[in-house]
């Protein structure tokens, strides 16, 4: 999509046309990555400000697509977090529902909306970062262009329509112009950068351009988590009943 139109045209349409272009870019990015299901095994390196490194592993399964998907993320290592799991039920018109299962105490608990800014079990992902959101829950605006890892990108501001539905007041997306893959997300609270997520090692898997490495920077803590996606599959048969609280407890 070419957003560099003549100045006279912009004088006529104003900001509304600019916002429409931004929404189309984000929608195209989501459409190109859409699948009926997804599964992968992830290796995580959590690197603190003192360069101390801890290793974790999890499995991830998702059924459905953006805004109407369900997913379960389950730790498989190290032993102290093995079996800890998170169920996320996404919605098209509001924030997701989340439940966490802790096998050591055989208890599940609902994650309240106000708690989703906290770190997810010692990683630099917050609970909210693990959600999927529908584009209709946000307003978008093209800010310009930038280059991320050598790739030309659109720079797009995203703001939640319902301010209470997100810990972030705004985010800035960098979406690649060659394949519409999101290369970076910078998230802000009242204009202060709090988290940066970088996507790299992009491969085409089952005709979907897919980042195999996700790096999350927690700016305030000066720490980062590097997630490597392994054994990734799309559109494998899954059952809806495997994405319930009962399934979360079964393991």
Locations of the language-model features?
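N-terminal mature ectodomain segment of secretory-pathway/periplasmic proteins
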Residues: 21-104, 141
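A short, amphipathic edge element
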Residues: 52-55, 130-142, 193-196
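Short, ordered beta-strand-loop transition motifs
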Residues: 63-69, 144-152, 205-206
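Short, solvent-exposed mixed-charge patches
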Residues: 250-251
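Bacterial N-terminal signal peptides that target proteins for export
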Residues: 1-8
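Hydrophobic h-region of N-terminal signal peptides that target proteins for export
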Residues: 10-18
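Gly/Pro-enriched, hydrophobic low-complexity segments
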Residues: 19, 27, 87-89, 97-101, ...
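Residue-level detector of beta-strand structural context in well-folded domains
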Residues: 138, 143-144, 171, 200
């Amino acid at each position: 999509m070419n957003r560099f139109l003549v100045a006279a045209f912009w004088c006529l349409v104003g900001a509304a046309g600019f916002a429409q272009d931004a929404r189309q870019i984000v929608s195209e990015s989501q459409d190109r990555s859409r699948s009926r299901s997804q599964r992968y095994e992830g290796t995580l390196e959590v690197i603190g400000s003192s360069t101390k490194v801890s290793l974790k592993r999890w499995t991830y399964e998702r059924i459905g697509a953006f805004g109407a998907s369900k997913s379960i993320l389950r730790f498989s290592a190290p032993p102290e977090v093995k079996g800890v799991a998170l169920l996320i039920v996404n919605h098209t018109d509001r924030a997701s529902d989340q439940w966490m299962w802790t096998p050591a105490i055989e208890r599940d608990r609902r994650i309240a909306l106000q708690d989703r800014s906290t770190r997810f079990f010692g990683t630099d992902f917050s609970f909210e970062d693990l959600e999927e959101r529908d584009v209709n829950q946000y307003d978008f605006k093209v800010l310009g262009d930038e280059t991320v890892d050598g790739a030309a990108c659109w720079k797009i501001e995203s703001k939640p329509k319902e301010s209470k539905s997100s810990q972030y007041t705004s985010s800035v997306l960098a979406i690649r112009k060659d394949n519409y893959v999101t290369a970076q997300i910078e998230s802000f609270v009242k204009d202060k950068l709090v988290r940066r997520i970088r996507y790299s090692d992009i491969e085409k898997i089952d005709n979907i351009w897919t980042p195999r490495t996700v790096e999350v920077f927690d700016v305030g803590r000066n720490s980062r988590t590097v997630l490597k996606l392994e054994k990734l599959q799309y559109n494998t048969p899954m059952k809806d009943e495997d994405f319930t609280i009962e399934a979360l407890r079964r393991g």
